[in-house]
Design a protein with these regions (language model features):
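Bacterial carbohydrate/catabolite-sensing allosteric modules
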Residues: 1-106
Length: 106
Protein backbone atom coordinates (compact mmCIF):
# COMPACT_ATOMS: atom_id res chain seq x y z
CA UNK A 1 0.00 0.00 0.00
CA UNK A 2 1.00 3.64 -0.24
CA UNK A 3 1.15 3.86 3.57
CA UNK A 4 3.48 0.86 3.77
CA UNK A 5 5.67 2.38 1.05
CA UNK A 6 5.79 5.73 2.87
CA UNK A 7 7.00 4.13 6.08
CA UNK A 8 9.58 2.06 4.22
CA UNK A 9 10.87 4.99 2.16
CA UNK A 10 11.53 7.16 5.22
CA UNK A 11 13.51 4.39 6.89
CA UNK A 12 15.40 3.47 3.72
CA UNK A 13 16.47 7.11 3.36
CA UNK A 14 17.90 7.13 6.89
CA UNK A 15 19.63 3.77 6.42
CA UNK A 16 21.25 5.12 3.25
CA UNK A 17 22.61 7.99 5.36
CA UNK A 18 24.23 5.53 7.78
CA UNK A 19 21.61 5.27 10.51
CA UNK A 20 20.97 1.86 12.08
CA UNK A 21 19.23 2.68 15.37
CA UNK A 22 16.08 4.31 14.04
CA UNK A 23 13.19 5.05 16.37
CA UNK A 24 9.63 5.13 15.06
CA UNK A 25 6.70 7.12 16.40
CA UNK A 26 3.69 5.33 15.02
CA UNK A 27 0.29 6.74 14.48
CA UNK A 28 -2.55 5.14 16.36
CA UNK A 29 -2.21 1.38 16.00
CA UNK A 30 -5.97 0.95 15.92
CA UNK A 31 -5.92 2.61 12.48
CA UNK A 32 -4.98 0.92 9.20
CA UNK A 33 -2.70 3.84 8.34
CA UNK A 34 -0.72 3.48 11.57
CA UNK A 35 -0.39 -0.27 11.11
CA UNK A 36 0.71 0.02 7.47
CA UNK A 37 3.35 2.65 8.20
CA UNK A 38 4.70 0.51 11.06
CA UNK A 39 4.82 -2.46 8.70
CA UNK A 40 6.81 -0.38 6.22
CA UNK A 41 9.27 0.63 8.95
CA UNK A 42 9.83 -2.99 9.93
CA UNK A 43 10.14 -4.14 6.31
CA UNK A 44 12.78 -1.54 5.48
CA UNK A 45 14.87 -2.56 8.48
CA UNK A 46 14.53 -6.25 7.61
CA UNK A 47 15.58 -5.64 4.00
CA UNK A 48 18.88 -4.26 5.30
CA UNK A 49 19.36 -7.01 7.88
CA UNK A 50 18.71 -4.68 10.80
CA UNK A 51 16.85 -6.24 13.72
CA UNK A 52 13.71 -4.46 14.89
CA UNK A 53 14.17 -3.09 18.41
CA UNK A 54 10.66 -2.88 19.86
CA UNK A 55 11.98 -0.47 22.52
CA UNK A 56 12.45 2.09 19.73
CA UNK A 57 8.79 1.92 18.65
CA UNK A 58 6.40 4.27 20.45
CA UNK A 59 2.72 4.66 19.63
CA UNK A 60 1.57 8.20 18.96
CA UNK A 61 -1.89 9.66 18.40
CA UNK A 62 -1.31 11.71 15.22
CA UNK A 63 -0.87 14.99 17.15
CA UNK A 64 2.11 17.11 18.19
CA UNK A 65 1.65 16.41 21.89
CA UNK A 66 2.04 12.69 21.27
CA UNK A 67 5.30 13.43 19.44
CA UNK A 68 6.52 15.24 22.55
CA UNK A 69 5.46 12.33 24.77
CA UNK A 70 7.08 9.80 22.43
CA UNK A 71 10.46 11.55 22.63
CA UNK A 72 10.20 11.60 26.42
CA UNK A 73 9.47 7.85 26.37
CA UNK A 74 12.34 7.14 23.97
CA UNK A 75 14.85 9.14 26.01
CA UNK A 76 13.64 7.57 29.26
CA UNK A 77 13.93 4.11 27.73
CA UNK A 78 17.70 4.36 27.53
CA UNK A 79 17.98 2.66 24.13
CA UNK A 80 20.33 4.59 21.84
CA UNK A 81 18.92 5.95 18.60
CA UNK A 82 20.39 8.22 15.97
CA UNK A 83 17.22 9.06 14.04
CA UNK A 84 13.45 9.17 14.47
CA UNK A 85 10.74 8.55 11.90
CA UNK A 86 7.31 9.93 12.80
CA UNK A 87 4.06 8.68 11.32
CA UNK A 88 2.97 12.19 10.33
CA UNK A 89 4.11 15.82 10.30
CA UNK A 90 2.27 16.79 13.49
CA UNK A 91 4.06 14.13 15.54
CA UNK A 92 7.36 15.05 13.88
CA UNK A 93 6.88 18.70 14.87
CA UNK A 94 6.21 17.70 18.48
CA UNK A 95 9.22 15.37 18.49
CA UNK A 96 11.53 18.05 17.06
CA UNK A 97 10.28 20.58 19.62
CA UNK A 98 10.96 18.22 22.53
CA UNK A 99 14.38 17.16 21.21
CA UNK A 100 15.37 20.83 20.97
CA UNK A 101 14.10 21.46 24.51
CA UNK A 102 16.16 18.50 25.74
CA UNK A 103 19.28 19.80 23.99
CA UNK A 104 19.40 17.11 21.30
CA UNK A 105 20.57 18.38 17.91
CA UNK A 106 18.08 17.81 15.09
Amino acid sequence: SDQHAAGAAAVAHLIARGHRDIAFITGSLDSPTGLERLSGYKSALAQQGIAVNEALIVEGKWNAQSGVAAVDALLAGGQPFSAIVAGNDEMAIGAMKRLAERGVAV
